[in-house]
Amino acid sequence: MKARRQRKIIEIIHRQVIATQAELAQVLRKAGFAVTQATVSRDVKELGLLKASDGQTVRYLPPGEQPVAAAEERMVRLFRDYVWEVNANESLVIVKTLPGAAQGVASALDYARWPEILGTVAGDDTIFVAVKSQRDVGGIRERLAGLLEG
């Protein structure tokens, strides 16, 4: 049910301008989904949706369609709100988050499209960041740790 609902959310935001979670919940209900505001909020977070403005309207966009600057801004916000430690060994950068936040933070890292990062694997509160080369590990660790300091 959750996967079907989230696919429907992506379909909806591609078809029409949705500016608020309340609006999205209303459209989902009309489509036959019994949702609460909390459910929609979790879905928005898990899908990595971000609000974007074209100067006249504000709407939700899926991560792949977000401008890189917006993806970077989202990542900074998520790091400040949910990450409490960044560490590394010789091959991986490890990011520790509050419980339940790793998936969203990892998604933000993926969509920021840093060229040194191959990808991420997230559990509940831990993210493994795969870096292109060993020589990049220290730099990525420092850059991510810097996001915590603001």
From Swiss-Prot:
Subcellular location: Cytoplasm
Primary location recorded for the protein, binned into one broad class: cytoplasm
Molecular function via GO: arginine binding; DNA binding; DNA-binding transcription factor activity
GO CC annotation, single: cytoplasm
UniProt KW rRNA processing keyword: no
Keyword Transcription regulation attached: yes
Recorded family membership: Belongs to the ArgR family.
Protein name: Arginine repressor
Organism field: Desulforudis audaxviator (strain MP104C)
